[in-house]
Each structure stands twice: as structure tokens, then as C-alpha cells.
Design a protein with these regions (language model features):
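Short acidic-hydrophobic, aromatic-tinged amphipathic segments that line or gate anion-handling sites
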Residues: 172-175, 237-249
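Alpha-helical substrate-recognition element adjacent to the catalytic core
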Residues: 14-159, 164
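Acidic, Mg2+-coordinating phosphoryl-transfer loop and its flanking beta/alpha structural elements
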Residues: 26, 152, 195-242
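Short, charged, surface-exposed secondary-structure boundary motifs
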Residues: 177-185, 227-235, 250-253
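Short amphipathic alpha-helical segments and helix-helix/interface helices
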Residues: 134-141, 184-185, 204, 208, ...
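Extreme N-terminal starter segment of soluble prokaryotic enzymes
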Residues: 2-8
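Substrate-recognition "cap/lid" segment bordering the active-site pocket of phosphatases
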Residues: 148-195, 201-212
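Generic enzyme active-site microenvironment
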Residues: 8-10, 196-197
Length: 254
């Protein structure tokens, strides 16, 4: 095991805010699959509202497809009722459009590859680091703590963005590395894990229940893409990490 402690961070919604890129790429991927439909270039408010429910990138392409409908379930139910039955709505949407997650994920990544190769600067400009995050990550080294990234985003795209914003984690695990609890188990065998910072509560709850990850400190990033009730009734072992606590020395984190 490495003598150096390691703090693990999710990427989207924790380090970087890429909301406009999520929409831009999801919109283009959807339009490549549904010819002749209209989707606005500006990020719709309903897309922003549903983003906290998204686990994998392909879901955003399907949400774009829901948004182009004039009388679909999202229009009939409204965002709140749709989100309350989110997983079932995804399954029904895949059936209705005749799609598979792999098709949507491939379409999304193709759009992103084209954007990176054709206009990298424009693609990067659709992202921004959350306020204070770059400085705090740089400060971890002074505390003797390394940091890594664990994300469901493709590794290559994440690496492009880390490079663009001059962020240098000691390790990067993208969606290709497998489910987050499995990656954390591997990391725990190699490092002295200090904690995992994530903005998806459901992921953190799975981590807490994973055998072999007992005692791992889990932090819910208060500045991320949180659902309305995510901050309420947090289970033991899961702490809400505010921006002020995040900026403070690790020794006084919750």
C-alpha cells in the first residue's frame, strides 16, 4: 500500500460544471438519430432540472429525445412527476424509440470526438471548474494528500478536460474502469484512502453498503447536481460537504 493518502473525486458535478456541453453533445447525438426534429441550441431548463438524476451519459441523449416530443411523458407529467419515476421512464423511452443504451452512448461519444478534433477550444469552453476547486486540489499536495478522479465519463474526454484546466491527478479512472465501488475496492488495496467526494447520493449509498469499503469516508458535494431531497436525512457515514468545509484543511472536514 502506498504510504501517501489518497482522496478520490467524482468529476462532473464535483470538479467541473459541464452543463452546456452535456446539452450541446446530447442534442447533436439525438439529432443524428432522429432526423428532422427540432431541439433548441440553448440548454433547456428541463434538461438542467433532470441532470441530477443522470447516472450515465447515454441517459442525456434519451432526455433530449423526450424534450423534442410535443406530447410525450415529460410534457404530460411535468419534470417532478417524470423524475419520480425516472428509471421506468428511461426503460419505456428506450422501448418506444427502439434504442439501446450502447447506441446512445456511442452516438454521444462520437459527437464528443468530433468536437475535440474539430474545435477543441470551443468544446473546452463549454465547461468551467466549480469556484475554488482548482485551488483546493492544488492545496492538497501541501497537506501530503494525493488526489484522483473516478468518473462514469469516458477516460479520454476526462483527460482532455483535466489537461485543458491544468489539473493533474495521480490517477484517472473513467467508465472503462468499471463500477465505482469496484474501483474503490481496488484503490483501497493500493492506497490509504482518505475519502470519496461525489455529487450523486445514490452512488455514495451503494459505496457505503459495499463489503470491503467499511469506514470509507463519503462526502456529498453540496455544490454539485443534487436532487431536491438529496441533502435530507443522510445516512451514517455520509456527510454533506459544503464549499466552506471543502476549502478548509482536511483535518477539520466532517
Amino acid at each position: 500500500m502506498s504510504l501517501q493518502p489518497l482522496l478520490v473525486f467524482d468529476f462532473d458535478g464535483v470538479i467541473l460544471d459541464g452543463m452546456d456541453e452535456y446539452w450541446s453533445s446530447s442534442r447533436k447525438a439525438c439529432l443524428s438519430l432522429l432526423r428532422g426534429v427540432f431541439l433548441p441550441e440553448q440548454t433547456p431548463s428541463r434538461f438542467r432540472q433532470l441532470r441530477p438524476w443522470v447516472h450515465h451519459g447515454w441517459e442525456m441523449v434519451l432526455i433530449a429525445a423526450f424534450l423534442q416530443e410535443s406530447d410525450g411523458p415529460l410534457q404530460r407529467l411535468g419534470v417532478d412527476a417524470f423524475a419520480a419515476d425516472y428509471d421506468q421512464q428511461l426503460r419505456a423511452g428506450l422501448d418506444r424509440f427502439g434504442w439501446k443504451p450502447s447506441l446512445l452512448q456511442d452516438s454521444l461519444e462520437r459527437v464528443r470526438r468530433q468536437a475535440v478534433s474539430g474545435d477543441r477550444a470551443g468544446w473546452v469552453a463549454l465547461h468551467r471548474p466549480f469556484k475554488g476547486v482548482q485551488e483546493r486540489l492544488a492545496g492538497l499536495e501541501e497537506e501530503g494528500v494525493a488526489w484522483s478522479v473516478l468518473t462514469t465519463k469516458g477516460r479520454d474526454f476526462t483527460d482532455e478536460l483535466l489537461d485543458a484546466f491544468q489539473l493533474r491527478p495521480v490517477r484517472l479512472d473513467g467508465r472503462e474502469s468499471g463500477p465505482k465501488p469496484e474501483v474503490l475496492l481496488r484503490l483501497r488495496r493500493e492506497w490509504a484512502l482518505k475519502g470519496f467526494v461525489e455529487d450523486r447520493r445514490a452512488t455514495l449509498e451503494v459505496v457505503l453498503e459495499t463489503p470491503g469499503l467499511e469506514g470509507l469516508k463519503c462526502f456529498l458535494a453540496d455544490w454539485g447536481y443534487l436532487r431536491p431531497a438529496d441533502r435530507e436525512g443522510l445516512p451514517e457515514g455520509l456527510d454533506l460537504l459544503s464549499t466552506s468545509k471543502f476549502a478548509a484543511p482536511l483535518a477539520i472536514w466532517p
